């Protein structure tokens, strides 16, 4: 063995001490990192649990909303079918008194000797019926003397106009047309002058 001088010994001792200090520092850092990782994994697992809980809540809410919407859709379809089936019920109920009037008129026609009284009764029933239709928004289309318009009229015949200013105008109405709130529900069948 060679002898070391005292300065070399100090240097070696200093180097060994530095190495030992570095190893200790590295060991402390590794322990600190391991503790951080353990704490981090606890945080991650806590976050995963929280996210899983939130997912389950949202999924449950979504399923409930889907079921609620499906029930709503079925209910509205049922209500719509009922409305289509019985939608005219109110209008038909209001026609029943007019039908009763017609029945009474028919009973009186058979026994009546006064034709004028029967005619007057039928006129009253007709007026009552037309009044009801008017309340419902149904109105007759005025045709005679008006210029022919395909939106309101259906020409079933043309005849020579009796006067020159009647050309292209309605001369006669064979069947009355009707509107429902200004929408034509039946065109008037008319004779037009040419």
Swiss-Prot record:
Region ranges (Disordered): 1-48
GO (cellular component) term, any one: cytoplasm
SUPFAM superfamilies: Coiled-coil domain of nucleotide exchange factor GrpE, Head domain of nucleotide exchange factor GrpE
UniProt-listed InterPro entries: GrpE, GrpE_coiled_coil, GrpE_head
Keywords recorded for this protein, A-Z: Chaperone, Cytoplasm, Stress response
Gene Ontology biological process terms in this record: protein folding
Biased composition (Polar residues): 24-34
Regions of compositional bias (Basic and acidic residues) in chain numbering: 1-14
GO terms assigned for molecular function: adenyl-nucleotide exchange factor activity; protein homodimerization activity; protein-folding chaperone binding; unfolded protein binding
Cellular location(s): Cytoplasm
Gene3D superfamilies in the record: 3.90.20.20, Head domain of nucleotide exchange factor GrpE
Family membership: Belongs to the GrpE family.
Role played: Participates actively in the response to hyperosmotic and heat shock by preventing the aggregation of stress-denatured proteins, in association with DnaK and GrpE. It is the nucleotide exchange factor for DnaK and may function as a thermosensor. Unfolded proteins bind initially to DnaJ; upon interaction with the DnaJ-bound protein, DnaK hydrolyzes its bound ATP, resulting in the formation of a stable complex. GrpE releases ADP from DnaK; ATP binding to DnaK triggers the release of the substrate protein, thus completing the reaction cycle.
Subunit structure, interactors included: Homodimer.
Name this polypeptide is given: Protein GrpE
Lineage: Bacteria, Pseudomonadati, Bacteroidota, Bacteroidia, Bacteroidales
């Amino acid at each position: 063995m060679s002898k070391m001088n005292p300065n070399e010994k100090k240097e070696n001792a200093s180097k060994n001490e530095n190495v030992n200090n570095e190893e200790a520092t590295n060991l402390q850092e590794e322990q600190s990192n391991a503790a951080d990782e353990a704490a981090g994994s606890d945080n991650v697992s806590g976050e995963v649990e929280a996210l899983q809980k939130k997912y389950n809540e949202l999924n449950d809410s979504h399923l409930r909303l889907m079921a609620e919407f499906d029930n709503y859709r079925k209910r509205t379809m049922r209500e719509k079918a009922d409305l289509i089936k019985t939608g005219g019920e109110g209008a038909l109920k209001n026609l029943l008194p007019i039908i009763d009037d017609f029945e009474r008129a028919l009973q009186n026609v058979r026994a009546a000797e006064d034709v004028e009284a029967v005619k007057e009764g039928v006129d009253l029933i007709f007026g009552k019926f037309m009044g009801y239709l008017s309340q419902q928004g149904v109105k007759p289309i005025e045709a005679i003397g008006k210029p022919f318009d395909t939106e309101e009229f259906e020409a079933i015949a043309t005849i020579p106009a009796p006067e020159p200013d009647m050309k292209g105008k309605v001369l006669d109405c064979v069947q009355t047309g009707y509107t429902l709130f200004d929408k034509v529900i039946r065109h008037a069948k008319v004779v037009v002058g040419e």
